[in-house]
């Protein structure tokens, strides 16, 4: 954070003062990105690069050391399956950065190393990312990678509904990952849900297994004729709902484009008309996103 660099500059000497102050200033925006943001340079590495900056403990903890922000994870289970258990599906962050350091995610690594029986501080936020009240309402679930997390809970919920005698509406599940052999998490549970009629279709995109990269948005377009009536609300007793979970930067935007393409292709809508349909879906709480 620039605030931390400014604080370090206040206790530095020589050329370190000028350099740190510049990095913390609006004029040093590009240099900050090159030095801090892009290589994921850690606070320890910064302090090693500027050895004259030696803060006392008060300044260090008050203005320099970053306060850890809470991490938000989607619950990947349903109380209908086990009222005493809550699960989370977390990708462990571990990558080598430009400085040569192996960067490990603070929260994901903590969870990975947690011992059985260890207490972990958590809190639960109220969410609108939930199945329609009517089990006959058709749904489309789109969640590559750990974006499948909430849909695992959805499948457990629909399994319990089916077991209680409820009639289930159509449910399409789109999942994606890089490699089938390495990244197809919960494959057995997805296939079981398909066999048992908990979902009506399962489409999986593997982006690294073939000569051409295939993503969930490609699978959505392939299934345009089935996706279209659910998005339009012309199938089932209730209007359909779309659920998207995962990457906000690329995936969610690409899925939105794919749905627009489906509406234009199958419904012969102009672009602005298709956009208005999706806008109404969002306004009517039929287009849900849990993205990061």
Where are these regions (language model features)?
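FNR-like FAD-binding dehydrogenase module
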Residues: 1-292
